[in-house]
Amino acid sequence: MPDLHIGGFQFVIHSVVPLFSSPPDRPSTAFSSPPAGAAADEMPVNVRLLPLRDATPPASRTLFESPVWSMTADGDMRRIEMRGRGCAEPYWVAQFQLPFRRVDVYFGPGQLTADGELMSPLSYPLDQLLLMYLLAEAGGMLMHAAGGVKTGGAVYAGPSGAGKTTLTRRLLAEGCEMFSDDRIIVRPWAGGLWLFGTPWPGDANVAANRCAPLARIHVLQKSGEDRDEPLAPAEALTKIIPCCSLPWFDPPVLEQSLQGLNRILQDVPHSILHFTKEAAQN
């Protein structure tokens, strides 16, 4: 498995066992090199893949717990554990120190193929959790949004059912270059604000490893007409927060994330995009 390049970060993989090669048609395969349009160096994040027997015990303070994954903390250390329902031992455990440039991921025997190759632990939810922490430090955000370039870089934010896939297909038909129809990264980079495609597509299956300067953020609203409605900064925050991947379970990092989002909204024009299925605009 080669390195992963997502949102201006290069996840440099170090493994003690051979890695399983993903099929070429998987979205993540396109993210094995820097994004097209990159205007600055990426920040390296070292990922060490180690056997589960070497993992440390859970930390003393629980931040989040569900039947599938949990996070504990001890000072600046964070520990994520992923396990299946009813499983005696975790699939994997990830541990990192804040602010982090390295994460140790400890894999269980169930993550190995019959040939002894390691299936990538850098998949949901670990990949997005790590990015939430990296982006909080960088002043950026992982958004539930479509995004791409027509007359400028634009983000189209909205929860499930808001019309991101519908709008993406329409914009593609109009010749717009789309980076994603479901998840977009917005962050300060190369002296400005940029949007990045991600390897997590929606129903339109758009997951392009591309980036571009950000010109505008739209909040999607299905309508019987097509118009762009200006959005006041205070209202924009309440509209866009539900479209953001935020570490609600980790208050200090959440505060960092919200400060970054507020700066983004101060620097980039934003509006409500009313649209119909028959037409779209940028």
Where does each model-flagged region fall?
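A noncatalytic interaction/capping subdomain that flanks phosphate/NTP-handling catalytic cores
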Residues: 1-160, 173-177, 184-282
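Conserved glycine(s) of the Walker
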Residues: 162-164
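Post-Walker A alpha-helix
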Residues: 167-168
